């Protein structure tokens, strides 16, 4: 299936009340330039939406690339997360043919993923701004450790734990986002859609490694980096980079 360009999605979201089906009550939040507020990644663009009736904000994810089995996977993920009551995770809802987009594609109706909007900044951005603050980094190290312990006790796994996929909320607590590579118990025996991000993944991880333990190495690597940085911030200046912490794939 071919998907629209980000620019085509932007035009569709600008008139969301006309182009959305069941979610027509949502309106886009605009940035300082009057454009729909958004962030984009390799396979999708995410818009910040507002339900004016309740004042609640949502994240609306629109896909730009095909991913085999995505619809079925997200239905299973949604079912699993619907039973989870934790601030570390947000609920998701996959909706087929929800958004009409005038594009060059053969199709004109496309799926979306609806999630609660998590206010805050990525852990990557937070560390960049605060790594010289020993108190802030020590608290982050503690809170990450609590989240890691919770995640390892669950029957599911995130699949791509890294600082850019963790939001630090204004109250300082953490929430995992981006569930494209998530494992849930109903997927046992399936292949993983991803092997995670190289600088945070076990070097021997393959598509066949897909169970509730796939986050263990990433969690350990990040926890070790955070502890070291909290004790000696200059380590990040020496060994770090903009898209990772102290370790790269060449270190494993």
PLM regions: where:
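Juxta-kinase regulatory segment immediately upstream of eukaryotic protein kinase catalytic domains
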Residues: 1-37, 72-74
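Conserved structural core of kinase catalytic domains
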Residues: 89-138
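Catalytic-loop of the protein kinase fold
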Residues: 148, 152-164, 168-169
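ATP-binding glycine-rich loop module of kinase domains
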Residues: 34-36, 42-93
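Conserved activation segment of eukaryotic-like protein kinases, specifically the C-terminal portion
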Residues: 190-204
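Helical subdomain adjoining the active site within ATP-dependent kinase catalytic cores
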Residues: 228-252
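Activation of the activation-loop gatekeeper triad in protein kinase-fold domains
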Residues: 178-183
């Amino acid at each position: 299936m071919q998907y629209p360009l980000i620019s085509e999605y932007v035009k569709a979201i600008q008139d969301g009340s006309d182009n959305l089906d069941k979610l027509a009550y949502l309106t886009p939040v605009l940035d300082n330039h009057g454009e729909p507020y958004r962030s984009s990644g390799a396979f999708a663009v995410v818009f910040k939406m507002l339900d004016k009736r309740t004042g609640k904000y949502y994240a609306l994810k629109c896909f730009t690339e095909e991913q085999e089995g995505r619809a079925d996977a997200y239905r299973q993920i949604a079912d699993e997360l619907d039973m989870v009551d934790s601030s570390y995770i947000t609920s998701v809802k996959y909706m087929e043919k929800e958004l009409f987009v005038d594009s060059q594609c053969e199709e004109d109706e496309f799926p979306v993923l609806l999630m609660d909007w998590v206010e805050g900044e990525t852990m990557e951005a937070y560390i960049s701004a605060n790594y010289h603050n020993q108190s802030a980094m020590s608290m982050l190290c503690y809170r990450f450790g609590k989240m890691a312990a919770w995640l390892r006790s669950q029957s599911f796994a995130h699949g791509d734990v890294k600082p850019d996929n963790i939001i630090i909320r204004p109250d300082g607590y953490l929430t995992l986002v981006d569930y494209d590579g998530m494992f849930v118990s109903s997927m046992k025996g399936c292949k993983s859609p991803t092997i995670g991000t190289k600088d945070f993944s076990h070097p021997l991880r393959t598509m066949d490694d897909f169970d509730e333990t796939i986050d263990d190495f990433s969690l350990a690597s990040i926890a070790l980096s955070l502890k070291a940085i909290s004790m000696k911030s200059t380590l990040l200046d020496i060994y770090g980079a903009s898209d990772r912490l102290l370790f790269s794939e060449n270190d494993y």
